[in-house]
Amino acid sequence: MIKIFKPKNKFKDISIIELNKIIANKKRLGLLKIGNEKLGKLIWDFSLPPIESCPDCESCKLDCYAVRYYNQYPDVKKCYDDNYKLCLNDLKTFKQLLIEQINKRNNNKRTKNKIKNIRIHASGDFYNQEYLNTWIEISREFKNINFFAYSKAFSNIPNLPKNLNIINSFVTIDNNNYLNYGTYENISKMRAKIKGIICPVTIGKKIDCSACKYCITKNKVLFVQH
């Protein structure tokens, strides 16, 4: 069950004219973007505004790297904001546009970098059940594509498709929940207890998500504050 969350009106209450402009722009440019330096070139990303779309961000909003990135680059902010407005106001069209983008790229024989791995939310989270269900439907539509995400919005989601890996950002140790993000000292102790790994990118290793691929199928990953 998704945690109760009410999006702000500035994202939900928009005019038909603004919505149609967003749809036209997303249809032209695409909803999925090729990964940044951390994700690498083999992973595509769809993001929403940080904090504004996150049902449970009290434990991480002060140190959220996505907030800095979001506030630093106006084009990124507009992209994430428009994504959120589209999803809140016309989820059906969001799904349709995303499917069209994937099919168009993957069915083009001249295109080299096919969409094979999708990171859901380098920024943002699953803000309600209907939105989560839409991603589940999309992942079932493309069984040959890997989808992965991190979330604080729920404790458990049963019967997820095998190609959709959603990692709970809270780690349970001795019946207590801890955020899987923090100082190197704290994260090292947690890693030993859960027998997981520390994201190599966050400890300075020269590797990206496209090469690592741990989070695509596994869930015991921890992150050093960076």
What is the role of each PLM region?
Residues M1-H226:
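Class I S-adenosyl-L-methionine
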